[in-house]
UniProtKB/Swiss-Prot annotation:
This is Putative pentatricopeptide repeat-containing protein At1g53330. Involved during embryo development. PPR repeats lie at residues 46-81, 82-116, 117-147, 151-185, 186-221, 222-256, 257-291, 292-326, 327-361, 362-396. Belongs to the PPR family. P subfamily.
């Protein structure tokens, strides 16, 4: 009988890499050689084995299991881990919004026989930024000289942090400091700054920075930079300039994407130049740029603003023909226009057909339908929709619910009113905000004392009566 061949660290690394289930990978890591003839002999893991399992566990947010592997790595003194492994671990903790664990990992790196440099510090700063821990970022910056000189990545993280926290002038000061210290800015640097300037309506400064990044610093603008500038120009009504920038991007061999075209189409529609949209769509086709869901939603919105439900519906059908899946925004816009032009049957049919089309209605969908049916005095249908939305955990707008109850009271629809009270009882019995709408509204109508008794009994049983207004 031949001897059982033991699993090598090379073989284990291969098995771990091919295992898609992180839990199964962890089980394999814990017991890599179950048929070993000497179970007391510890398995000799390679650095690659540790790297693969750490990546799988961190990417799946299995942080407790990750801690177990890290502890094993710490005590495995044969292995000298590379810094990039800890950079990845710190990034995983940042994505998981675990700043204390990220800090702890960085502080413990020397115990793993790994020297810290500005690279791992950058990972820590990035993780803290993701967690919104700006003060802790400042604390760590005070000791940056221990790990080396700040590089472009360091400045990019800090500039992004200032921009995100609303201190944009500080971001510009960091850029000046960066240049003085002869740290070359990157495309990320300029992208963050130009986006911030555009957001702050400082379009002239943003355009100058776009000019300087190429002429002074030799960094080519990206499609994202052009997107920020074109959007900002459209917002201030500079459509001609926006189109010139789009042409400039093509001249610079930058492929303009659907997001830029969507911005331009939206701006043309808002400016009352809808007749020019077809030319933009033709250009997109010529340039090989396919419209995406956002582009089609912009077109749908344009038709909905003009109350042209037929054209909006045609765009919806075209999306499906082109292999694009309309999203809930697409449907909500068309539902809205159907109700505005009093096409209740078409709206109800589309709403009911959404799940079959692969799109589940959201809170806004239900509110649009409920509000539309109420305005159309379709009380029975509105009560059914209200019951369904409450069952799914959605709530109507306070003012619309108040108006619905008022209309039911005024029209004497007591049977429907009773069903509505029953629905509210099941759906949001403990919601004082909703009951505070119902009681004063219903108390105005003397003919519905039975309904009021039912309502008050419901509140006594399930709601905070002390918070309720009295009749």
């Amino acid at each position: 009988m031949s001897a059982v061949k033991s699993v090598s660290s090379f073989r284990l690394a291969s098995l771990l890499r091919r295992e898609n289930d992180p839990s199964a990978a962890m089980k394999l890591f814990r017991n890599p050689d179950p048929e070993s003839t000497n179970p007391k002999r510890p398995f000799r893991y390679s650095l690659l084995c540790y790297d693969i399992i750490i990546t799988k566990l961190g990417g799946s947010k299995m942080f407790d299991e990750l801690d177990q592997v890290l502890l094993h790595l710490k005590t495995d003194t044969r292995i000298v881990p590379t810094e990039i492994i800890f950079c990845n671990v710190i990034n995983f903790f940042g994505r998981g919004k675990l700043p204390s664990r990220a800090l702890h990992m960085f502080d413990e790196m020397p115990q793993y026989r790994c020297q810290r440099t500005v690279k791992s510090l950058n990972s820590l700063l990035s993780a803290l930024l993701k967690c919104g821990e700006l003060e802790k970022m400042k604390e760590r910056l005070s000791s940056i000289d221990e790990f080396g000189k700040p590089d472009a990545c360091t400045y990019n993280i800090l500039i992004h942090g200032c921009s995100q926290s609303g201190c944009f002038d500080d971001a510009l000061k960091l850029f000046d400091e960066m240049v003085k210290k002869k740290v070359k800015p990157t495309g990320v640097t300029f992208g963050t700054l130009i986006h911030g300037l555009c957001k702050d309506s400082r379009v002239k400064e943003a355009l100058k920075m776009k000019h300087d990044m190429l002429k002074v610093y030799g960094v080519r603008p990206t499609v994202h930079i052009y997107a920020s500038l074109i959007k900002a120009l459209c917002q201030i009504g500079e459509l001609s300039f926006a189109f010139k920038l789009k042409d400039e991007a093509y001249e610079g061999k930058i492929k303009v994407d659907a997001a830029i075209y969507s911005t331009l189409i939206s701006s043309l529609i808002k400016a009352g130049r809808s007749n020019e949209v077809s030319m933009i769509l033709e250009e997109m086709s010529e340039k090989g740029c396919k419209p995406d869901t956002v582009t089609y939603n912009v077109l749908i919105n344009g038709f909905c603003v003009e109350n042209d439900s037929e054209s909006a519906n045609r765009v919806l059908d075209e999306m499906v023909e082109k292999g694009l899946k309309p999203d809930v925004i697409s449907y909500n816009m068309i539902l809205g226009v159907f109700f505005r032009i009093k096409k209740w049957e078409e709206a109800t049919y589309l709403f009911e057909d959404m799940p079959r089309r692969g799109c589940s209605p959201d809170t806004l969908s239900y509110r649009i339908v409920f509000d539309g049916l109420c305005e159309g005095l379709q009380f029975e249908e509105a009560a059914v929709i209200l019951d369904e939305m409450l069952f799914k955990g959605y709530k109507p707008r306070r003012d619309r619910l108040e108006g619905f109850l008022q209309k039911l009271c005024e029209s004497g629809k007591l049977e429907i009113l009773s069903k509505v009270i029953s629905s509210l009882h099941r759906g949001i019995a403990g919601d004082a905000d909703v009951w505070s709408v119902m009681i004063p509204t219903m108390c105005k109508e003397p003919v519905i004392s039975d309904s009021i008794d039912l309502l008050l009994n419901t509140v006594k049983e399930d709601g905070p009566l002390s918070a309720m207004p009295q009749c």
